[in-house]
Curated annotation (Swiss-Prot):
GO cellular component: bacterial-type flagellum; extracellular region
Domain of life assignment: Bacteria
Family to which this protein belongs: Belongs to the bacterial flagellin family.
Keywords: Bacterial flagellum, Secreted
Gene: flaA
UniProt-recorded Gene Ontology molecular function terms: structural molecule activity
Organism placement in taxonomy: Bacteria, Pseudomonadati, Aquificota, Aquificia, Aquificales
InterPro entries in the record: Flagellin, Flagellin_C, Flagellin_C_sub2, Flagellin_N
Name the record gives this protein: Flagellin
Function: Flagellin is the subunit protein which polymerizes to form the filaments of bacterial flagella.
Species per Swiss-Prot/TrEMBL record: Aquifex aeolicus (strain VF5)
Cystine bridges: none
Length: 518
């Protein structure tokens, strides 16, 4: 029992406890009213730090996903433009295939060329005008564009879209023809000699080198279509190399395709002025295509060029095609797939004099000047092995070792859609390959855009989950558990009620001293 009246210890202790309970109850009340466990740094300093960092990451993830949505929108616009370009290229390819048909006359091919040029202009406009928020997407300027997707520094994805301008679409072309007028003239002039300028011997090879450093080499043993012995030397068709290249899966993977053509012009004039075939004399002319005899005929009288052309076409059956050049003075010989054109002229002179004064078979190459060959009682042979055209999507270097093709390392020259010309059969054939390469480029760009969209969408989905989990982690630290906090509040409330009652009792204790004063 208290016997002092100047200091009521029990009341003081009860009051202190009451104030503590009041403070705790008020804080619990604020937590219940705000839903926050941490109302200030004093409540949980380390918890506040962690919660604020988590909130920062969550905000960054939210904005990063918004950035991803912007990027996906831009890429979808780009993909739509590229899809339109593909449709135009497909139509261009159809027209190039149509132009390659020799049934078309020059006017029809010119009309097809105009259609192709209009399609090319449409591609140009799409490539120049496709944009997102003023940013050009398909003209090559959309390069190394960074999309910041994450909540942290350097969490970016670099996006590039290659140019689809017509001057950027196409392929690399390397063209070579090993025959020259001089070589052919030598064959005709030096009758009976062996010409090895167009041959492949054992150990010879043809090599391709690409810009990424990879290389492919074909040696003469089987890979070029022939078996060679140690001493043998054989004529090699352009068509044989074409078949080898086009059937090689590695080259196909590099986008390499070969095409061969063989068009030879000869200054052949058959009239009474230049060719005098006396009675009893014979001139036998034989043509081979790829080693196969396709035409042979013996003439004992004057023959015109028109008749000679008709004789060849009637007998060769499409394996060798004869026509006249625009001047009407040259014989033009062509093979469908670049096979070797071989010619033999055999003169049987009945009286021993020179009867052939001007059959210029020496100018088998287009545009080359012929020479007069005086032949008596002998056989002359000339060979043109075809023009080899190699085309690819990426730049490459091709070199032949021991064969006439590409004796010096030759890099492909880029030919774009602007170079497409289908006014000739050769141009239409090359145009098909160039457009195929353009389609390959466009499809590559489309797949890259699609892959990037999928990548961004995957990042978006992952970050959406990460944001949810981050928000939950922050909530656990920062927000109040109402069930637990209500229990605490009830406890403090009861303590306050009992504290007030006990403080009243403690304040009454000093009154007991009055009993001693009675």
């Amino acid at each position: 029992m208290a016997t002092r009246i100047n200091y009521n210890y029990e009341a003081a202790v009860t009051y202190t406890s009451l104030k503590q309970n009041e403070r705790l109850m008020n804080k619990s009340l604020l937590r219940l009213s705000t839903g926050l466990r941490i109302l200030s740094a004093a409540d949980d300093a380390s918890g506040l730090f962690i919660a604020d960092q988590l909130a920062l990451v969550s905000a960054g993830l939210e904005q990063g996903n918004r950035n991803i949505q912007f990027g996906i929108s831009a890429l979808q616009i780009a993909e739509g433009g590229v899809s339109q370009i593909y449709d135009k290229l497909k139509t261009m390819y159809q027209k190039a295939v149509s132009a390659a048909n020799d049934i078309n006359d020059p006017n029809a091919r010119a009309a097809l060329q105009r259609d192709i040029e209009n399609l090319r202009d449409a591609i140009l406009k799409i490539a120049q005008d496709t944009e997102y928020n003023g940013i050009r997407l398909l003209n090559g300027s959309f390069n190394n564009v960074r999309i910041h997707y994450g909540a942290r520094s350097a969490q970016t994805l670099s996006v590039s879209i290659s140019s689809v301008l017509p001057q950027q679409l196409g392929g690399y072309v390397a063209e070579d023809s090993p025959a020259t007028a001089t070589d052919t003239n030598n064959v005709l002039t030096n009758i009976g000699t062996t010409n090895t300028n167009y041959s492949v011997a054992s150990g010879d090879s043809l090599a391709f080198t690409f810009t990424d450093g990879t290389s492919i080499t074909f040696n003469s043993l089987n890979q070029l279509g022939y078996d060679f012995n140690n001493t043998g030397t054989y004529i090699l068709d352009a068509s044989a190399i074409v078949n080898t290249i086009n059937n090689n899966p590695t080259l196909q993977g590099k986008g390499i395709r070969a095409y061969a053509e063989n068009v030879s012009e000869a200054d052949l004039t058959f009239d009474t002025t230049n060719v005098n075939i006396d009675q009893g004399d014979e001139v036998t002319i034989t043509f081979y295509s790829g080693g196969e005899l396709v035409f042979t005929k013996t003439y004992t009288d004057t023959v015109t060029l028109d008749q000679f052309i008709a004789d060849i076409n009637n007998q060769a059956g499409g394996k060798l095609i004869a026509s006249k050049d625009p001047s009407g003075t040259k014989l033009v010989l062509s093979t469908p797939n670049g096979e070797t054109i071989s010619v033999e002229v055999t003169v049987n002179d009945a009286d021993g004099d020179t009867v052939v004064s001007s059959i210029n078979l020496g100018a088998l190459l287009q545009g080359a000047a012929g020479t007069v060959v005086n032949t008596s009682g002998a056989t002359a042979s000339a060979v043109k092995v075809g023009t080899l055209i190699v085309m690819g999507s990426e730049n490459f270097t091709v070199q032949g070792t021991g064969i006439a093709y590409f004796t010096a390392a030759t890099s492909g020259t880029f030919n774009s859609l602007n170079d497409v010309d289908v006014t000739t059969n050769k141009g239409a054939e090359i145009a098909q390959v160039l457009i195929q390469r353009a389609v390959r480029q466009v499809d590559t760009i489309r797949t890259q855009i699609g892959s990037t969209i999928n990548n961004l969408q995957a990042i978006y989905d992952a970050q959406a989950v990460a944001k949810d989990n981050t928000d939950n982690a922050e909530s656990i630290i920062r927000n109040v558990d109402f069930a637990k906090e209500m229990t605490e509040f009830t406890k403090y409330q009861i303590r306050m009620q009992s504290g007030v009652a006990m403080l009243a009792q403690a304040n009454a204790l000093p009154q007991l001293v009055l009993q001693l004063l009675r």
